[in-house]
Amino acid sequence: MTNRLKEKYTNEVVPALTEQFNYTSIMAVPKVDKIVINMGVGDAVNNSKNLDKAVAELALISGQKPLITKAKKSVAAFRLREGMPIGAKVTLRGERMFEFLDKLVTVSLPRVRDFHGVSNKAFDGRGNYTLGVKEQLIFPEINYDDVDKVRGMDIVIVTTANTDEESRELLAKLGMPFAK
């Protein structure tokens, strides 16, 4: 079973982008390479159980086991030592990536309160898009009653596009709701 968004990419987005940007080969058409979801858990310094909850929630959202990130440097002001676990991240590729992107665009983002579209200024100059989510409750897998603390996350969509314009068109054609 192929993913709905992957089929849309192959059948609609590739021909449209080829025509719009005059690519000579379909291999030159930008595609979504990977999606990285990062959740920084600052309060894991005091209580490591908070990190376990965040890891469990991230696993539910992404469908795969997160990698626990550790502090690179010691910072006395935050009572943080080098090597302490302070977050979790997941890198999605292939089928899971398309499933997550589909779910994000069609289900999760419309559930955000007062949602008027995502910013179209969050591109990094190399065709990658970064999106901040303030609460994990927008994802349908998260049960509202099981949440002990509202946590946000960063979602980075890495594309093979060379420019922000190409990347913006790719994501818009895949259904990303950019603010007008």
From Swiss-Prot:
GO CC, alphabetical: ribonucleoprotein complex; ribosome
Superkingdom classification of source: Bacteria
Span of the signal peptide: none
The UniProt record lists the keyword tRNA-binding: yes
Keywords: Ribonucleoprotein, Ribosomal protein, RNA-binding, rRNA-binding, tRNA-binding
Gene3D superfamilies in UniProt: 3.30.1440.10
Pfam families referenced in this protein's UniProt entry, alphabetically: Ribosomal_L5 (PF00281), Ribosomal_L5_C (PF00673)
InterPro entries, per database record: Ribosomal_uL5 (IPR002132), Ribosomal_uL5_bac-type (IPR020930), Ribosomal_uL5_C (IPR031309), Ribosomal_uL5_CS (IPR020929), Ribosomal_uL5_dom_sf (IPR022803), Ribosomal_uL5_N (IPR031310)
Keyword tRNA-binding assigned: yes
GO BP terms in the entry: translation
Family classification: Belongs to the universal ribosomal protein uL5 family.
Protein task: This is one of the proteins that bind and probably mediate the attachment of the 5S RNA into the large ribosomal subunit, where it forms part of the central protuberance. In the 70S ribosome it contacts protein S13 of the 30S subunit (bridge B1b), connecting the 2 subunits; this bridge is implicated in subunit movement. Contacts the P site tRNA; the 5S rRNA and some of its associated proteins might help stabilize positioning of ribosome-bound tRNAs.
HAMAP family associated with the record: Ribosomal_uL5_B
Subunit and interaction comment: Part of the 50S ribosomal subunit; part of the 5S rRNA/L5/L18/L25 subcomplex. Contacts the 5S rRNA and the P site tRNA. Forms a bridge to the 30S subunit in the 70S ribosome.
Name this polypeptide is given: Large ribosomal subunit protein uL5
Protein's organism: Lactococcus lactis subsp. cremoris (strain MG1363)
Gene symbol of the encoding locus: rplE
